């Protein structure tokens, strides 16, 4: 699912419940949530959405890598990378859904 598909699906759900809210409102809501999450991670904060999962930062220490084309050694600096860990409810829901699909 892409961001555009998420916005479209949210817009459809909002339209079912309240005709006052349109696609632009759903787009603003999704963009606001994603911006808030990105800003929190950029500040080093952890994000936890109960039943869904958590977003955190993993530290990657500096290392010596190789250029795959030339084989030359390359110094790779330290960095922090975003990491998502699925919550128990999400893992169980995905597993159950996929098991049902394979058995059908």
UniProtKB/Swiss-Prot annotation:
UniProt xrefs under SMART domains: BHL
CC annotations in GO: chromosome; cytosol
GO molecular function: DNA binding; structural constituent of chromatin
Function per UniProt: This protein is one of the two subunits of integration host factor, a specific DNA-binding protein that functions in genetic recombination as well as in transcriptional and translational control.
Pfam families noted in UniProt: Bac_DNA_binding
Assembly: Heterodimer of an alpha and a beta chain.
Superkingdom assignment: Bacteria
Protein name, entry field: Integration host factor subunit beta
SUPFAM superfamilies: IHF-like DNA-binding proteins (SSF47729)
Transmembrane segments: none
Native source species: Chromobacterium violaceum (strain ATCC 12472 / DSM 30191 / JCM 1249 / CCUG 213 / NBRC 12614 / NCIMB 9131 / NCTC 9757 / MK)
GO BP, one annotated term: DNA recombination
UniProt record similarity statement: Belongs to the bacterial histone-like protein family.
Assigned keywords, A-Z: DNA recombination, DNA-binding, Transcription, Transcription regulation, Translation regulation
